[in-house]
Swiss-Prot record:
Ranges in a coiled coil: none
Gene3D superfamilies the UniProt entry points to: Zn peptidases
GO cellular component, as recorded: cytoplasm
Name of the protein in question: Peptidase B
Amino acid sequence: MTNNTMLISLSTQPADARWGEKATLSVNEQGFTIHVGTTSLNGKAALATIQRAARKIDGQGIKHVTLAGEGWDLANSWAFWQGYRGPKGQRTVEWAELNDADKKELNDRLKIVDWVRDTINLPAEDLGPEQLATRAVDLLCDVACDAVNYRITKGEDLREQNYAGLYTVGRGSERQPVLLALDYNPTGNPDAPVFACLVGKGITFDTGGYSLKPSGSMDSMKSDMGGAATLTGALALAASRGLQQRVKLYLCCADNMVSGNAFRLGDIIRYRNGKTVEVMNTDAEGRLVLADGLIDASEQNPQWIIDCATLTGAAKMALGNDYHALFSFDDELVAALQESAKEENEPFWRLPLEEFHRSHLPSSFADLNNIASGAHTAGASTAAAFLSHFVKNYQQGWLHIDCSATYRKGAVDQWATGATGLGVRTLANLLLSNAK
């Protein structure tokens, strides 16, 4: 411990009255004390208090701290870091002593979840479709290189191989669209069955296309690749925890731009599974690129297909930035994810998805419209329903996550502005605890 570090301790005792009613922070000559407001240093309420207190400490410009005294287990240490970390500037934490397993887990989270947050926070100028794909490869090779093989398909090769949705959305940008197909196979057996396929939306900037977003909706669209980053992090964390099952990762990466070559309203996309889609809103592009990844995933016949995307504003209207929205026809898979989310203390909430939602996308010229008709306003549910048309066995083993808790446009009491990394640990846990 150095002399210029601030000590941070935990207490179940209330703060002295001079610090204010229900104060969560007090100061003495040794440093800060976080008063968790409960009789235990463990539990959901204590974790939230620690995270909020860490945000306040960072807000005071304190960039070097030492976690001192009792109570700094893995969960509390991680809660502190989630609140303390910000998108700019360096912060140094001297951690309390942990056992070897918890120390490894903490270090893996610091590496992988912080990679997710940093990647989502990158400006679009620095992160195009191909850069996103190569960053994902670099992370997974760093974690488990011997188990990783991958293929990157881009530009005209996508068109020639009939990746119609991804090519159509990405063709309007000078930066070529890219599909990353990564095979994590720790068994070493090329004939091993695929346990799960992960399909991520990787729109590295979304103008909305000709259905142009206003500035207030476009200013955070560097984060529209949050689903791809989250799934990459989840697979990396699961691998670091010892995942022994084969998993394939598909990242559908593109810019959605306006240009003379960009796709237009009224265009019809013809997919490899025989479905045709009429484009009536170019700002509903995420589902168009995911469709290609879901077709590939279905061809692998995995037990599970999990897609993750910053897909709709409707999910954010329902849940804010506080929960990821969860959709599935498979109640058992939903229950498994919710149990994993509870164990990792991460927020997921199930929203409706019923068979009738699949009929809410009529088109006069194609099998499907890429947006629901005006009479059907359940935007998040109909977006999920659209995706179901590209999953062969959509009623079983398929999970769609509309990841509305990925990014915050402004700071709140628990989070700095920017990416949160929420969902990475839950999905890693799900892959591990339910792989047979």
